[in-house]
Amino acid sequence: ETGGKIEILIEQVLDDQNALAMIKSSKKINMDLKIILSNNYVVQILERRENLFLIQLNQGSFHELMELNGHVPLPPYINRPDEIDDIKRYQTVFAKNKGAIAAPTAGLHFSEADFELFHRNNINYTFITLHVGSGTFQPVKVKDIDQHIMHTEQFEITNETKIKIELAKKNGGRIIAIGTTVLRAL
């Protein structure tokens, strides 16, 4: 509506038309602001929820909108626009479910060949789903770490994965978490 620049980082898709998002704007963000995007998509800001905004889409779904207009949210230390190769470069080879706004970086170095090697050497592994949120980008801003408010994270651990982990522990095996987000989830 105002012609200003705006960046929307979808934190969580609630349903096809509603999502929670971080919004950066060159101008003040007012409630009920309508953001007009390409292909006749209009996003309306409904309310503020702490550091996020509840936004509503006028048509289609947020997943469709992200496929058409979305960009890979690169880590802040990478100071360049995203490229088409970033879609694969910043995603783990074992990613299956949508929902994270950033890759769980500890797993980025694994390749299909690594998992083939694990299999050939009878090294058991299993997966959990991490929905890494925007809090992963938030710095600690307080001197006393006990005063830092930690962000929440969503994850999914299937019953099959739970059984594999319990069996490994029962048999004296080691459980090695790849990354701090996995460690917190376990």
Residue positions per predicted region:
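Surface-exposed, charge/polar-rich loops and edge strands
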Residues: 1-186
